[in-house]
Structures are given as structure tokens and as C-alpha cells.
Amino acid sequence: MAATIGQKPYEEGFRLVIAHIDCPRLDLRPNPLYESDHMSYFRTHYYGGIRKYQWATIPLAIHGVFTRADGSSVNFAIGEDENDPVFCITDLLPHLGAEQNARPLKDGIKAEELNLLIGSDAVDDENVKEAVKLNTMILLNEKYGITEKEFMRAEICLLYTSDAAD
């Protein structure tokens, strides 16, 4: 916030200048984690500026902060360190996406399809219904000490990650 304070009282009038920036981004929804087709995903909220299809198949990192019930917080970033996994939003191969190919360009990938692939390894237990989702949550808990309920008190976004190149 910036302000210039004038000489006259505000009752005599003032000028107000307001601005904002467009910051294209994907944030995670409050309950983002789900399993589909033996893969775990995060559901996202899309905030505009760039076309939705430009988010697909690019390397993404996850940045955020979890606020625990006791008020403490955990900051984290996954995907920036060279030993971290790098994430992406999947897309169909052209020869498999006939329905998608028939859509106009602006609808090539819909906002509700911008889901981040987060895991593919399952817990080794045939009795577990969502074994990949459970394993993803176990890994997040072991590394960051977070639980699924804490996503409700989290601010998490997806950012493009790649080294600059000529």
C-alpha cells in the first residue's frame, strides 16, 4: 500500500488510486486430495490470465503453509530441490483424446480438469479402498507432519518450476 497525504482535510475531497495485478496461478481447494484410476490427485482452483491448456504437462512445484489446530504453521515447498519430485497436470495423448480434440481451443482443458497428479504408489494392503491416496497422505505426514484435515487451514499454490535457459 502506498499513500500520499495532502495538505487539506479529506472532507474537502481526495483522490483514490486503486490497482491490482493479475497473477495467474493454481491454488489447491480446501479438500484437494482424491484418488482416480489408481492415481492420487489434488483438485485446484484456477485464477486467470493465461489459457488453461497452458498449465498442462509443464513442471510444477507445490508451495504453501499449513496452519495447525494449535495455531503453529508449517511452510513447505516440494519440487524446487533437485531431489524432489516434480509434478504436472496431465493431458491426453492426441490419438486418445477425440472428444477433447473436438472442443474449441479455449475449452481444450476445462478448469475442472486442472488436477495435479501427486502420486501413483499404493500402500501394500488389498483391503484399503483408496490405497494410492492413503500412501500419498502417509508420505506427506511422514515428511511434513500434516494430516488430511489440515488442508482446510492451508494456503497452497502451484508454481512453474524450471531453471532458466538461453
Give the positions of each predicted feature.
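Aromatic- and glycine-enriched pocket-lining scaffold segments that form the walls
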Residues: L140, C157
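A generic, well-ordered mixed alpha/beta core segment in the N-terminal half of proteins
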Residues: G13-A98
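Conserved small/polar residues in nucleotide/adenosyl-binding loops
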Residues: Y160-D166
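Structured, contiguous alpha/beta core segments that scaffold functional sites
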Residues: T90-D91, G97-E112, A165
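Non-transmembrane, aqueous-exposed alpha-helical and coiled segments at domain scale
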Residues: G6-G13
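Glycine-rich, flexible beta-strand/loop modules in the N-terminal catalytic cores of phosphate-handling
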Residues: S36, D84, R103-I138, Y144
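A non-catalytic alpha/beta surface segment that caps or lines the substrate-entry region
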Residues: M1-T4, K149
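Flexible, glycine/charged-enriched surface loops at secondary-structure junctions
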Residues: G145-I156
